[in-house]
UniProtKB/Swiss-Prot annotation:
The modification Asymmetric dimethylarginine is found at residues 396, 407. Its main location: nucleus. It comes from the Eukaryota. One of its GO terms (biological process) is positive regulation of type I interferon-mediated signaling pathway. It is found in: Nucleus; Cytoplasm. Residues 1-25 are annotated as: Disordered. This is RNA-binding protein 47. Homodimer. Interacts with A1CF. Interacts with APOBEC1; form an mRNA editing complex. Interacts with RBPMS. One of its GO terms (cellular component) is apolipoprotein B mRNA editing enzyme complex. PANTHER family: HETEROGENEOUS NUCLEAR RIBONUCLEOPROTEIN (PTHR21245). Disruption phenotype: Homozygous knockout mice die before birth. Residues 71-149, 151-233, 246-318 form the RRM domain. It comes from Mus musculus (Mouse).
Amino acid sequence: MTAEDSATAMNSDPTVGSSTKVPEGVAGAPNEAALLALIERTGYTMVQENGQRKYGGPPPGWEGPHPQRGCEVFVGKIPRDVYEDELVPVFETVGRIYELRLMMDFDGKNRGYAFVMYCHKHEAKRAVRELNNYEIRPGRLLGVCCSVDNCRLFIGGIPKMKKRGEILEEIAKVTEGVLNVIVYASAADKMKNRGFAFVEYESHRAAAMARRKLMPGRIQLWGHQIAVDWAEPEIDVDEDVMQTVKILYVRNLMIETTEETIKKSFGQFNPGCVERVKKIRDYAFVHFTSREDAVHAMNNLNGTELEGSCLEVTLAKPVDKEQYSRYQKAAKGGGGSAEAVAQQPSYVYSCDPYTLAYYGYPYNALIGPNRDYFVKTGSIRGRGRGAAGNRTPGPRGSYLGGYSAGRGIYSRYHEGKGKQQEKGYELVPNLEISPVNPVAIKPGTVAIPAIGAQYSMFQAAPAPKIIEDGKIHTMEHMISPIAVQPDPATAAAAAAAAAAAAVIPAVSTPPPFQGRPITPVYTVAPNVQRIPTAGIYGASYVPFAAPATATIATLQKNAAAAVYGGYAGYIPQAFPAALQVPIHDVYQTY
């Protein structure tokens, strides 16, 4: 065969012609030639779908299952004009790439981030170590971290009498790719579940499709409406770290089971091997002196019964405190203004957290009986699930969801040890009054705006020692300097008021303070029409029987008072003074 015959045969072969076809998503790209050269060099496929361009998946000659969880890394801070022809040579230096997914925009540029999946887990970890902050362009650094491949859904609204097998069977009927179902027994009645379950799927895609299918209003299970959301993905702990763990996580305990009973049960194989036990509701952490004793106890006691309850025993997962704090913020949509603190499991709040978050720290500090926990963080949404599935406060919003099956992350309860209780603000130092329900309330000085020296006769009343005295006598102390006495001419004044009502002008000056009244407006003289004034809390006047003070005389001589005629002997009820008012009168707490 000559060279011409060979060329003719190649041109007539349809497979050869199809191999030169430009893949969809590559045709028309700014760097089309570079992408085609990359495909020819590596033999990988490239296709664009659903706003992302997939390179590989699987690679040429791949045989075997899909790479395990933890083989994918997230790549961020990618320049908008960088594509696979520059990314692949960088990331293939640390391992074999199974798949690279570059998020694309409609204008043909990338969206600044991508996902790279390796064939093995150790290659992904190496990529994080070596390629994070890699300078892809002068002055442009890539951000590389482990990707959270969430394959777990939270499903609520499950009938409490359903068993794990029934739930697994029902979920598998309506969704695909179900691997496992995690169901927690009720702490009070082990024959019932807690009304929710965690469903694990074989891949993130399968979980996403199941979530879309199970959205509320589309499917009912056992005739019940269900709630579906992403669960908090289980935190991945390095295998080398897990090899040093000597703490066991024990769940499904009875509420009545004591720490002494748990210590005796787990220490039966080697007396003295258990250092201590920390029990929280229906789960516990058992600390051993050596890892061998912990593993031996786990193998022998997992699945056994203790005081009528079947135990689930696993190795606890240690988590770096700083890493866990960052993870919590990312998983719940970013932290709020509250400082990150340890989660306190299972506290029943007697007050509405939506309302408390509005008033802020000083008001939260007065609310009982759980005020110590309200001031630490504002609970709006995104409620986390602790190791035993209990609700705990979390910041508003949910990026990866607000629920977690928990697997014994024992660093949580270490956070709160030896921590000082936060105290509220003491507005008036060194003054104690009787506690109420059972909060100790500090009195505070409430300064009403527009205080003037001309009203010096209105002195602040002494702070009462008892709250009840403050309620009863506050107004009495306020009006006592005026020396209000019964006026025999009250009836005549009322008649004059009725006659002058039509000629009294309205005051157009807006009130200088648009706040709510601290106390109600009182009218001392009956049947006297109120005059609209530029008062701060209301329009009302108090009559004087004997205006003897210099201040009142000045008021009567004031030209502005002349237009009021017979009302010049009255003074506004809204006293511009400083007075002592108990805080509970300002912010009602009961």
